[in-house]
Amino acid sequence: RIEKNVELSYDESAVSKGRKLKDLCDENALKDIEAAISLVSSAGKVGVIGYCWGGSLSWKAACEKVNLSASVCYYGGDIPSLINLKPNCNVLTHFGELDQGIPIDKVKVFKESKPDVLTYTYPADHGFNCDHRKQYNKVCAKIAFDRTLSFLEQNLC
């Protein structure tokens, strides 16, 4: 919607550009998710997975869209500040305990206030699941991946 063929790395200038693009399209992103859900929902149950900003969008989609069966949110930075939202589907969240952008005390408050949301924390940093980042943690990524597959199997199959 904003710029074609955007592919960003994880260096400082790319992250800065990504934040600017996010600010320009936050509202439209949920509309795009809704359109994608609509497109595939005739095939059966639909789930979403997001990482970082996408993790926050997956949380928002779970709370604002009623035709989702599952949502998986990896280290969504906005999630603790959206604690007032109530999901309409089953949700699984993954957070890194060493993530300085998402304070673990806020994650704990979120977890306590949302007992129906499966929330896991890992001894890892933000981006622990991305093998293109220095924060990648193979062990934690594997555990989170296995939990994600199990969750999706339970909720989509």
Locate each region found by the language model.
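N-terminal cap/leader regions of alpha/beta-hydrolase-fold enzymes
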Residues: R1-C157
